[in-house]
A protein has these predicted regions:
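A short loop-to-beta-strand scaffold at the N-terminal edge of the catalytic core in hydrolase folds
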Residues: 5-16
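Conserved HGGG/HGGXW glycine-rich cap/lid loop of the alpha/beta-hydrolase fold
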Residues: 15-54
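Conserved alpha/beta-hydrolase "nucleophile elbow" surrounding the catalytic nucleophile
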Residues: 26-28, 52, 80, 84-89, ...
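Active-site loop/oxyanion-hole signature of alpha/beta-hydrolase fold enzymes
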Residues: 46-83
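Flexible "cap/lid" loop of the alpha/beta hydrolase fold
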Residues: 90-135
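Conserved alpha/beta-hydrolase catalytic His-Asp/Glu region
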Residues: 117-118, 128-181
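Short beta-strand/loop motif that positions the catalytic acidic residue
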Residues: 178-179, 185-187, 191
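Conserved alpha/beta-hydrolase "acid-adjacent" motif
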Residues: 192-198
């Protein structure tokens, strides 16, 4: 099995069936390779999301809903189950409002914003405001990134950094009660990035 280029000519995926029933969506900074060990156990497809793995970056920054719209038109109509890890879980929830699926399996997905994310977003908005006024030195910019930025934020650049900010700001708390698709949650009890309390509240 090898990566195949999908019909958009930009996005790659691991596909082991002409009519895959399960679509795997990886987390931020990851790739379809995360699912290689289980891919062959199912009729499935695992996407390298735009901007990750072998897939090209999007032309403009995207939020999870825009990823969902893009992918819904890209994956085979035979897909019945979406498996989303972290960032991929957010995308899966949005996809369920575009097309009917039998089940969403969400693994450590940041469905609602926690206090740490909210605090970071508040600081980031102030930082952007001051930066637009040219009131922040290069040294201060670097200090801000090192102090408040997550590893994902530090590693992302350009379009993908803007995409990350949009992803963090995407709060699904109002959407979740409206989901008509069966959802199963898988969480790590000791997950410190997306704590178990997020799953309990969702």
């Amino acid at each position: 099995m090898a990566l195949q280029l999908l019909k958009d000519g930009k996005t790659f995926a691991e596909i082991n069936s002409d009519e895959p029933k399960i679509c795997f969506l990886h987390g931020w900074g990851r790739s379809s390779n995360d699912f290689i060990k289980i891919l062959n156990k199912f009729e499935s497809i695992a996407i390298d999301l735009p901007g990750f793995g072998k897939s090209e970056e999007p032309e403009n920054s995207m939020n999870p809903k825009e990823y969902a719209e893009y992918l819904t038109n890209l994956i085979p109509d035979t897909v019945e189950v979406l498996v989303g890890h972290s960032f991929g879980g957010k995308i899966a929830v949005h996809m369920s409002f575009i097309k009917k699926y039998e089940k969403l399996l969400l693994i450590g997905a940041p469905l609602i914003r926690n206090n740490r994310q909210a605090n970071f977003n508040f600081r980031l908005n102030i930082y952007k405001f001051l930066n637009n006024l040219n009131l922040i030195s290069e040294k201060s910019k670097e200090k801000f990134k090192n102090k408040y930025g997550s590893e994902d934020y530090k590693n992302a650049t350009g379009i993908m950094r803007d995409t990350l900010v949009k992803t963090v700001n995407d709060d699904l708390s109002e959407l979740l009660p409206k989901v008509n698709t069966k959802i199963e949650l898988i969480w790590g009890e000791n997950d410190t990035v997306i704590p178990l309390s997020i799953a309990e509240e969702a």
